[in-house]
Amino acid sequence: PWDFDYGNVLTVIGGYKFKFRESKWYQRFRESTIFPYISWIPFMVSDQLEISFRYSYSGGRPYTPKHYNFRYRSWFINPAEDLNTARYDYYSRLDIMILRRFNFKKINLTTFLDLHNIFDKNNVWEKMYLDNGSIEWAYQYKQMPVLGIIIEF
């Protein structure tokens, strides 16, 4: 197989947008004295609240196994063997994003929480062949939360 022949690839994306600004109960809540003190809470309602997800799956990426020569202390690929005869483990990742938008008179404020790799799966990036003849696995990043603020003028 070619270097990027994953076999199967699946990506599912979805989300929903809640428009609370148009609701009368939200307008009353926003004008209340308590709103400025609790609006920073991550899952608190806002003018617009978006919740979205992305799930990615792909079959194992092919690679060519290397052999270790103890005499020369080096790794090599046997030219008599076919290339890309082995595969890494499958790749799977679920990301979730929560976006909150606030509209003010002169600016718009957006806060977001983006959670990457919710399942905390060790997705293999590559095999690392060390000089001493051992093998270690290099993984892509595991769980990673990203927080952010966007200010629009």
Model regions and ranges:
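C-terminal beta-signal and adjacent terminal beta-strands/loops
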Residues: 30-32, 42-49, 54-76, 89-93, ...
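Gram-negative outer-membrane beta-barrel transporters
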Residues: 1-43, 48-58
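Intrinsic disorder/low-complexity detector
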Residues: 5-10, 97, 116-119
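Extracellular loop and loop/strand-boundary signature of outer-membrane beta-barrel proteins
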Residues: 1-2, 37-39, 81-85, 132-137
